[in-house]
């Protein structure tokens, strides 16, 4: 697959994108996502190669989740999705899985206290079967 990281097309997701988003989430081990928030998709050569969902809780905007197709990783898709969401909404809060923390740190995200994360979003971590192994880190992208 060819993916030009300098030109991923990002747009708001439509109902027609639901199956591709569900497949990416399932492949990432996230199971079935609950319908909430607003999702945006990244396209390369007309194919969805990633998505980000933004959820509003307690006046803040949260990334919940961001997923990039494994074949499109390290090509700028995740960076483009995060930058686009920040441009649309301002500061973004989220809980990073441990292995993804270096990506977020390189993007300029900072660690925050767990209490900064809305309980509505934090419960996703509390009920996750991978919670103990995940080494989750609450973060903000300003």
Residue locations for each model-derived region?
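Short amphipathic alpha-helix that is part of the acyltransferase structural core
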Residues: 1-31, 39, 43, 115, ...
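A generic "binding-loop/recognition-motif" signal
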Residues: 38, 59, 99-100
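Conserved beta-strand in the GNAT
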Residues: 41, 47-55, 60-67
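Conserved acetyl-CoA-binding loop-helix of GNAT-fold acetyltransferases
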Residues: 68, 74-87
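Conserved GNAT acetyl-CoA-binding A-motif
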Residues: 82, 87-99
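Conserved active-site alpha-helix within GNAT-family acetyltransferase domains
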Residues: 98-125
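Cysteine-cluster motifs in flexible loop/terminal segments that predominantly coordinate metals
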Residues: 120-136
């Amino acid at each position: 697959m060819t993916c030009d990281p300098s030109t991923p097309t990002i747009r708001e997701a439509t109902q027609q994108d639901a199956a591709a988003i569900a497949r990416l989430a399932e492949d990432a081990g996230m199971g079935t996502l609950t319908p909430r928030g607003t999702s945006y998709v990244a396209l390369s050569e007309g194919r969805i190669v990633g998505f980000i969902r933004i959820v509003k809780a307690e006046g803040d905007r949260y990334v919940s989740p961001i997923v990039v197709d494994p074949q499109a990783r390290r090509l700028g898709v995740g960076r483009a999705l995060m930058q686009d969401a920040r441009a649309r909404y301002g500061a973004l809060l989220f809980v990073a899985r441990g292995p993804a923390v270096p990506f977020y740190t390189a993007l300029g995200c900072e660690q925050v206290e767990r209490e900064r994360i809305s309980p509505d979003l934090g419960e996703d971590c509390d009920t996750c079967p991978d919670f103990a192994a995940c080494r989750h880190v609450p973060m903000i992208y300003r």
